[in-house]
Design a protein with these regions (language model features):
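All-alpha amphipathic helical-bundle segments outside canonical DNA-binding/catalytic cores
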Residues: 60-72
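Active-site activation/catalytic loop segments of kinase-like enzymes and analogous catalytic loops
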Residues: 13-57, 72-89
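Activation loop entry of protein kinases
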Residues: 1-2, 14
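C-terminal, non-catalytic tails of nucleotide-sugar-dependent glycosyltransferases
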Residues: 52-55, 59-63, 110-120
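Regulatory N- and C-terminal appendages and interdomain linkers associated
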Residues: 84-120
Length: 120
């Protein structure tokens, strides 16, 4: 089963950066890892993970990473906002709709703080 809502044809780096979002999201917010001790957990740091991705894909780096990091978090906030709308209309199908809708603002705030930090 495929979920076409999030399917894209475009820059594969955007998909990788979407995956990196877990490093910047607070623990307890979806699959957020921010603030956890990666070494203790045996998880590579964000920089180590990016370096491994670049090595395996033959890239010198991810020059648009800051922009894409902000974009993917805002995109997730927009998706959560859509779920909030479905919840308000009584058409939300997920048992987790209420919890998902509740993180709209925290995600938007995270994206905005990343934009400010990156001076975008």
């Amino acid at each position: 089963v495929l979920d076409w809502e999030l399917s894209t044809l475009g820059d594969p780096v955007a998909d990788f950066v979407y995956h990196l979002m877990m490093y910047r999201m607070p623990a307890g917010l979806f699959t957020g890892l921010a603030g956890l001790d990666f070494a203790e957990l045996g998880i590579p740091s964000e920089e180590e993970y990016v370096a491994a991705y670049c090595q395996r894909t033959g890239r010198d780096g991810l020059p648009d990473r800051d922009y894409l990091s902000v974009f993917v978090v805002f995109r997730l906030a927009a998706i959560c906002h859509g779920i909030r709308g479905r919840l308000a209309r009584g058409s939300a199908s997920s048992a987790h709709a209420e919890a998902t809708a509740a993180v709209t603002e925290p995600l938007a705030e995270l994206a905005w703080s990343q934009a400010l930090a990156a001076r975008l």
